Amino acid sequence: MKPLFVMLAVLPFLSACNQPESPNAELFPATGAENVNPDTHLVLTFTDSPIVGDSGMIRIYDTMSHQIVDSLDLSIPSGPTESRTYGPECDYTKIPYDYTRTHMPTNRDTRPGTPSGTAEPTPPDYQLNIIGGFTDAFHFHPIIVRDSTATIYLHNNMLDYNHSYYVTIDEGVLTLPDHSFHGISKEHNWSFKTKDSVPASTDTLIVDANGQGDFNTVQGALDFIPDFSQKQTVILIQAGDYEELVYARNKTNVKIKGAGMDRTRVHYANNEVFNPHPLTVKTNEWPGTFPSRRAAFMLDNCSDILLEDLTIATDLHGQAEGLLLNGERIALYSVHIIGSGDALQANGTIYMESCELDGGGDTILGRGSLFAYRSNFRNDGGPFSWVRNTTGNHGDVF
């Protein structure tokens, strides 16, 4: 009996040895979480500040089929860091940009970088992400580190409702100063299940970065609203920090309300260098030109929109709008806009009340009519306003 006793004693030890080492991080969504919003980011919180590597893969799999649903290749740079040189062939489009669409293209059904308008395809030299149906795509950071937290940004619209997923992260994608993190394998079982179905109504949508609302991101809520809806939708953004690139087009009758200027902040590190206009097409000289991609928050070809009680900011300098508006009957109440050059681009009919605006030269750019009431505007040098209003358009009124 003694040999049998020894064998039985050894089996638990061998089983323990086969278990993967703990990932040494707090995970969000938590392992085994249910009712997760499909627009969730993947978040790892460590005890020390992680370093993002320049190689390795992040993959997310469907649990049932074990097929890869999305992947991020860290060997691809996030985006340009130096300005482009444009040739004489770069000019404004001679035909109006076409905003019509029968459905919103996503990364699931369209190759990021697919050209629209008169643009050429966006080269795949950098990370590309279709946001808000803009198929030409945006450069983006697949991982952003703040203090000891690493947030992974999947390509938009890749996860679905009523599905289970698991995540793997190659060793070297993230490292810690003490080298105690070696990635996450399938055996670590970082898995979660999304909500069974979409929100029952578009009347009111709650955005909460902690996953307690209908969506985790502002973009997720905007994508859910049908184009040119005749029914009003209220998006309530809970207090928190929302680091995301926001682009919406063809949205109407939407109220976007935060919890206060000092409590709800939507921001991203974007500018003309990181997301430049196409090599052969200029942007924003007159209505109908190719849309700009350089702002942190963009409402394009939108009307009857109200923004209230939040801060919108870009985290970069240069030609860098915090907020870019292109549409009619857009109102801002108690909104703090922070940008650099062209901090606010206002095209169309815009009303501002009790707002704050901080920027650099050309603090306000656009083809307004902009009417500002009881609002404060500050810049750190250079022209305050560069209005390119056309005949019959009165420009900006303060």
Indicate where each model-derived feature is located:
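Sec-dependent N-terminal signal peptides
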Residues: 6-8
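Acidic, low-complexity Ser/Thr/Gly/Pro-rich repeat segments typical of extracellular/periplasmic
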Residues: 20-199
